[in-house]
Amino acid sequence: QTHVMLGSHTYPIGHPKQLTMFLLNNILGGGSMSSRLYLSLREKYGLVYNIDSQAVPLSDTGYWNIYLACEPQHKDQCLELCHKELKQLRDTRLTATQMQRALRQLEGQMAISAENQENNALAMAKQMLYHHHAPAWQETFAKVQQITPTQLQDVANEVFAPEKIYTLLY
């Protein structure tokens, strides 16, 4: 089995583009079987055992990565397909339908996550530490709903630029 990670730097906690990155990552591969990476590499081609992406804001920086596990003979094709999805997000603005689908998916994930008391307490504690305010998930989602397809594409071009992406194979 081969493990592959692609990633780059992204925004710190509180950055104005943090929520845009959060939504963009969710579309790409964050936490859902309807993400682009999952649908392509797992469902369509059956190349990976698992695949996801995450965007992690830290106090002074942040990082974003894709992780996948596959058979060694599939790693090159998997890398090619990952880069294809990144390029598509850089080059093509989401349609209104795609945007609404992404927002509905994220809203459902946030609502389900809020039902977990431990997750909720940890998220609220982090918010209090960094912002001295712990908004309900609905307040955060209302801000996410203001994100435009153009803003998503701008962040994709900034964060997913090929020259900024590092690759780790092990």
Predicted features along the sequence, with ranges:
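M16 family metallopeptidases and their MPP-like homologs
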Residues: 5-11, 42-91, 96-147, 164-170
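Bilobed periplasmic-binding protein-like "clamshell/Venus-flytrap" ligand-binding domains
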Residues: 153-169
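His/Glu-based metal-binding/catalytic segments typifying zinc-dependent metallopeptidases
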Residues: 1-35
